[in-house]
Curated annotation (Swiss-Prot):
This is Large ribosomal subunit protein uL11. Part of the ribosomal stalk of the 50S ribosomal subunit. Interacts with L10 and the large rRNA to form the base of the stalk. L10 forms an elongated spine to which L12 dimers bind in a sequential fashion forming a multimeric L10(L12)X complex. SUPFAM superfamilies: Ribosomal L11/L12e N-terminal domain (SSF54747), Ribosomal protein L11, C-terminal domain (SSF46906). Forms part of the ribosomal stalk which helps the ribosome interact with GTP-bound translation factors. SMART domains: RL11 (SM00649). It comes from the Bacteria.
Length: 147
């Protein structure tokens, strides 16, 4: 018989750096989840992604047990790392802070394909390019899907 799901918690935590302090502790403690057990499991599964911000979806059950799924880093974070900038533009339509190529957009789209709500790499690329535009990052060249 399946366990009764009590709820979901969505967090963004640095890989290999989960600890009981906020935001992890209060979010899990208020639901009665063993905070230290989650931190140990999360840190063990994300050792190879240390320092990267990772979205995690925690499913907790009525018996206070839990499961969690680790997603790929958000597109915005990947774009900031790729462009080597700390933040996007305050005025993205007027002031561009960096440039990337369509090949770099394709790389991010392929990485995020499992988490995005699309079926083709071209549609994933347009989503990534839209995020880049909204951050003030220009995409150089012609969209490769316009052949």
């Amino acid at each position: 018989m399946a366990k009764e799901v009590a709820g979901l918690i969505k967090l963004q935590i640095k890989g290999g750096a989960a600890n009981p302090s906020p935001p992890v502790g209060p979010a899990l403690g208020s639901k009665g989840i063993n905070i230290m057990e989650f931190c140990k499991q999360f840190n063990a599964r994300t050792q190879d992604k240390a320092g990267k911000i990772l979205p995690v979806i925690i499913t907790y059950y009525a018996d206070k047990s839990f499961d969690f799924v680790i997603k790929t880093p958000p597109v915005a974070i990947q774009l900031l790392e790729l462009a080597k900038i700390k933040s996007g533009s305050a005025e993205p339509n007027r002031k561009k802070v960096a440039e990337i190529t369509w090949e770099q957009v394709r790389t991010i789209a392929q990485d995020k394909m499992v988490d995005l709500n699309c079926f083709t790499i071209e549609s994933a690329m347009t989503m990534v390019a839209g995020t880049a535009r909204s951050m003030g990052i220009a995409v150089k060249g012609e969209f490769p899907g316009n052949n």
